[in-house]
Amino acid sequence: MLKGISPLIPPELLKILAEMGHGDEIVLGDANFPAATMGKRVVRCDGLGVVEMLDAILALLPLDTYVDAPVALMATTAGDPEPPIWKEIAATVEKHAPGTQIAFNERFPYYDRSRSAFAVVQTGETALYANVILKKGVIGK
């Protein structure tokens, strides 16, 4: 155990977050997300939800302030309602990075973007459309 590090973050994920550089992306996937197909590196967090993992990760990971939207969600398919979890995701992003914009990518472009991500965190989240891409920023003055 380490001080100040959420016990939700397994050692493998902590290493990945440290290895990521400016502009690298990490995907938080829900239980339906094809993580093994998309990710070069997959960290399984099956018993945890996307929002709690997002909260733990954003406590450590700076978001990229040099892009318009360093956070992206998978857009709903036509006719599907807006998922209630989006409000929780937005509130969590706002808590850690006030004013951060969130982009919405259609499903197949989202999958394409996910394939080039540094890593994928597979959660046990059962809410639909609960997938989040985070672009890492920088620390410094």
Which residues make up each language-model segment?
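Gly/Ser/Thr-rich active-site loops/lids in small-molecule metabolic enzymes
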Residues: 11-12, 42-58
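Aromatic-anchored, charged helix-turn/loop surface patch used as a conserved interaction hotspot
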Residues: 53, 57-82, 89-93
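Fold-independent oxyanion-binding glycine-rich loops
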Residues: 5, 29-31, 36-38, 45-46, ...
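Structural motif
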Residues: 3, 24-27, 41-43, 64-73, ...
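Solvent-exposed alpha-helices and their adjacent loops that cap or buttress functional pockets
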Residues: 9, 18-20, 34-35, 66, ...
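Long, hydrophobic N-terminal alpha-helical segment
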Residues: 1-44
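Glycine-rich, aromatic-bearing surface loops/beta-hairpins
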Residues: 80-141
